Amino acid sequence: PQWVPAGKADSFPVGSVNTTMISYKRKQAMHSETVNVPILIRRDTEKDFICFNSSCTHLGCAVSWDPTTKRFECACHGGAFDVDGNVLAGPPPRPLDRLPWKLENGIIMVEVV
């Protein structure tokens, strides 16, 4: 596992849900590659965030936040998740995967494998 920066904490307003891109080097056998992965960050309070993997737990399609319905939605097969990542509708077998996070000098760091 490694910790990678997801952005400055103050760029995520309290009460917001945002998609942001993280970039890191993933090692595979004898080589490594740079991977760019979108994640979802929800900011509840000044110091409280929840970071989600943005892949639907059904087949891995991208999930996005719909501010009108206030839920995460997957356009591929109609999957829907509540603000906490719990399944509301569709075929997803489990909630959205959460990413461990920490604040380090004002930067949100997320743990990736």
Model-derived regions: residue spans:
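Soluble extracytoplasmic domains of inner/organellar membrane proteins
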Residues: 53-59, 73-82, 89, 95
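N-terminal pre-ligand scaffold of iron-sulfur
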Residues: 1-57, 61-66, 95-113
